[in-house]
């Protein structure tokens, strides 16, 4: 009885091990060997050249996304002290108003009240500026993640194009590969990229709304100071460089 149970367990463990090896094999990256590809003429590599160009474009987009993230982080560091400066302006304006009230001059009081209003509005502007830059960092980070998924997709498409080139050239080496495995890799990477791009689009929308709020408060302060409003206004946020697009 014990030997029967032991034999059953041993057989089950072997089956599990074999199955695991099969799963690992299916989940591994599907690639076409350079040796097989090297048997083709350059004129037979059209699909490969196009896929390689798409991969290069995806890598360039990632570099741009990294640069945008760094710029947003640097801008936030510069902007953060502005909130302290705004509070200092409020404190100064409040002191002037108190002094004006003691003097009893209506004109001086009105002027001090206006200065206090401008100082408070300036604080709102600085708050909105920091909030926008924080959203900009989130958007840049999401964009960077999307470009990484785009690179993964481009790599899968590159391998798929290599197999396609072998098949079009009627190379016997093409029979060594299972086309469905390459198709599955492209489909899986495509879903990952689509999900990441959706998150990046949502982050971009949030950054745009924060930018619009900042522009409104900025224009409010400019109007009170008799200055020209910010060019463009709400909705004029420049589109970031290197936005993830379908390769």
Annotated model-derived regions:
Residues 17, 21-25:
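Hydrophobic core
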Residues 27-32:
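Bacterial signal peptide processing site
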Residues 2-16:
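Bacterial N-terminal signal peptides that target proteins for export
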Residues 33, 37-242, 247:
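Extended amphipathic alpha-helical heptad-repeat regions
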């Amino acid at each position: 009885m014990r030997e029967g149970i032991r034999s059953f367990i041993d057989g089950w463990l072997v089956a599990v091990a074999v199955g695991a090896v099969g799963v690992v094999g299916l989940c591994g990256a599907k690639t076409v060997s350079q040796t097989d590809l090297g048997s083709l003429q350059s004129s037979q590599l059209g699909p490969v050249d196009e896929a390689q160009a798409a991969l290069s474009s995806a890598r360039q987009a990632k570099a741009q996304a990294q640069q945008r993230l760094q710029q947003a982080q640097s801008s936030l560091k510069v902007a953060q002290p502005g909130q302290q400066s705004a509070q200092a302006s409020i404190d100064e304006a409040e002191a002037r108003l108190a002094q004006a009230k003691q003097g009893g001059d209506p004109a001086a009081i009105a002027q001090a009240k206006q200065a206090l209003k401008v100082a408070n509005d300036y604080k709102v502007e600085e708050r909105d500026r920091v909030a926008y830059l924080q959203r900009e960092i989130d958007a840049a980070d999401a964009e960077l993640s999307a470009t990484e998924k785009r690179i993964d997709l481009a790599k899968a498409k590159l391998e798929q194009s290599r197999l396609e080139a072998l098949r079009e050239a009627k190379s016997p080496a093409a029979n060594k590969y299972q086309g469905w495995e390459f198709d599955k890799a492209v489909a899986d990477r495509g879903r990952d990229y689509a999900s990441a791009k959706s998150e990046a689009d949502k982050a971009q929308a949030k950054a745009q709304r924060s930018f619009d709020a900042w522009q409104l408060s900025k224009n409010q302060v400019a109007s009170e100071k008799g200055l020209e409003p910010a060019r463009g206004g709400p909705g004029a946020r420049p589109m970031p460089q290197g936005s993830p697009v379908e390769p």
